[in-house]
Structures are given as C-alpha cells and as structure tokens.
Regions:
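Conserved "HGTGT" condensation-loop signature of ketosynthase/thiolase-family condensing enzymes
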Residues: 1-94
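Active-site-proximal alpha-helical scaffold in enzymes
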Residues: 97-111
C-alpha cells in the first residue's frame, strides 16, 4: 500500500454497486430490487457486506486488486460487521460510523 499523499490517476467514479437487505426490507415494496435476504440483520450484516462488495465487483468486471480503497460502515458499534465482512479482501478499508448518514459519508469521502 502506498504511504503519504495519494494522487489519483483518474477522477473518482461509481462504476458498480451491490445491495443486500434483511427480511423486512425484502418483504417491502422494493423487495425485488435487492440481491439477498437473511432472517435477521444481526445474523447477516457481515455476510451482507461481503456479498455487496462481491456483487459490485462482479457487475463491474473489476477484481479486488483494481480497488484503491473500500469505504464501508454499519449500525453496530465500531464497524464490527463491516470489519469482519470485508477483512479477507486485500484493499485498504476505511470504517465509517455515521448511523443513518453512513451512505452519504461514504459517497462524499469516496469521491
């Protein structure tokens, strides 16, 4: 991993995405828009993080070594689910904790 100031060769962009949800979200009006469901959020959050990243990589055609950094967070203290779910990926991980603002925080920091 590079140390110091990082200068990007290309502008940041969102090239792919993946989404996973719990049972209640899947049973809602947008249920068909999601990739994955599990019985409870707590049982599945780490797996959901892993699946979402794999889904985004698969859709984009990228491999993990093409990724400069992962910005992710969750609603469990100290980004436990994100940390465990993404631990086996060989890319720098930035754990975000902003509760409901985590998605906006990730988009802002990632861009």
């Amino acid at each position: 991993m590079q140390k110091g100031i990082i200068k990007l060769n290309t502008l940041p962009s969102i090239l792919s995405n993946g989404s996973v949800v719990g049972k209640k979200e899947h049973d809602g009006p947008l249920g068909d828009c999601f990739t994955f469901e599990m019985p409870t959020w707590e049982q599945s959050e780490s797996e959901m993080q892993r699946l979402a990243l794999n889904e985004a990589l698969d859709k984009s055609g990228f491999k993990i070594h093409d990724i400069d950094a992962i910005f992710a967070g969750d609603l469990i203290n100290q980004c436990t689910s994100s940390g465990y779910g993404l631990a086996n990926f060989d890319a720098p991980f930035f754990g975000l904790f902003g509760a409901c603002s985590t998605i906006a925080e990730g988009l802002l920091l990632g861009s």
